Amino acid sequence: MKSKLPLILINLSLISSPLGANAAKIYTCTINGETVYTTKPSKSCHSTDLPPIGNYSSERYILPQTPEPAPSPSNGGQAVKYKAPVKTVSKPAKSNTPPQQAPVNNSRRSILEAELSNERKALTEAQKMLSQARLAKGGNINHQKINALQSNVLDRQQNIQALQRELGRM
């Protein structure tokens, strides 16, 4: 227990400290031809221009143009050129004409009638399954299955009543 106490205290101090206030400057380094990010500056590193973490927007971040790296002796004096592709963000064109909408009551009524039809079909199917379970061959009556089927039939009946009430309000 004593050995875990310092670890717990360190974790609590990390959790309670605001990370945004302690954010360090980030540097980009090119080491052996690979880009590495670090918080410790060195000779081959330069400051990066990264967007802040947690900044949400609908626009994409466009990388700034970086200076070309100096030729390194490891690649035979040839300069490796890398330019980040610059992408322009275009906003979608907005249509001035609103879409044609059908009358709300007619479409709602047709949806409710379709749902009522589906519920009636589901009710007859649930009633068939319940009657088959009650007439089980060999005397093996599964009471849990019968209770679940009865609950299903009751749910369907209540759904039908609710749909009929809703249609009656129109």
Curated annotation (Swiss-Prot):
Comp. bias regions, Polar residues: 93-107
Annotated signal sequence range: 1-23
Lineage of origin: Bacteria, Pseudomonadati, Pseudomonadota, Betaproteobacteria, Neisseriales
Annotated keywords: Coiled coil, Periplasm, Signal
GO biological process, one term: establishment of competence for transformation
Domain of life: Bacteria
TM regions (residue ranges): none
Region (Disordered): 87-107
Protein name, as recorded: Type IV pilus assembly protein C
Function field: Required for stabilizing type IV pilus (T4p) in extended, nonretracted conformation on the bacterial cell surface.
